[in-house]
Amino acid sequence: VILLLLTASAPSVDARPKTEDVPLSSFRDNTKSTLQRLLKRVNCCGIDESCCS
């Protein structure tokens, strides 16, 4: 009976805030590579139009 009361009063999985499963380091790596790609495109397009795709 006590176990049932404890189980019923415990917070459910739905009550917890949702978080991403992706580790922070992976997020940083993705952000860094995206920024590098954008910077390369900006610098390249000023010089050579063929790399702007």
From Swiss-Prot:
Record's subcellular location: Secreted
Propeptide segments, given as residue ranges: 16-41
One annotated Gene Ontology cellular component of this protein: extracellular region
Post-translation changes: Contains 2 disulfide bonds that can be either 'C1-C3, C2-C4' or 'C1-C4, C2-C3', since these disulfide connectivities have been observed for conotoxins with cysteine framework V (for examples, see AC P0DQQ7 and AC P81755).
Coiled coil: none
InterPro entries on file: T-conotoxin
Major localization listed first in the record, in broad terms: secreted
Gene Ontology molecular function: any one: toxin activity
Signal peptide segment: 1-15
Family listed: Belongs to the conotoxin T superfamily.
Domain note: The cysteine framework is V (CC-CC).
Protein name per Swiss-Prot or TrEMBL: Conotoxin Vc5.3
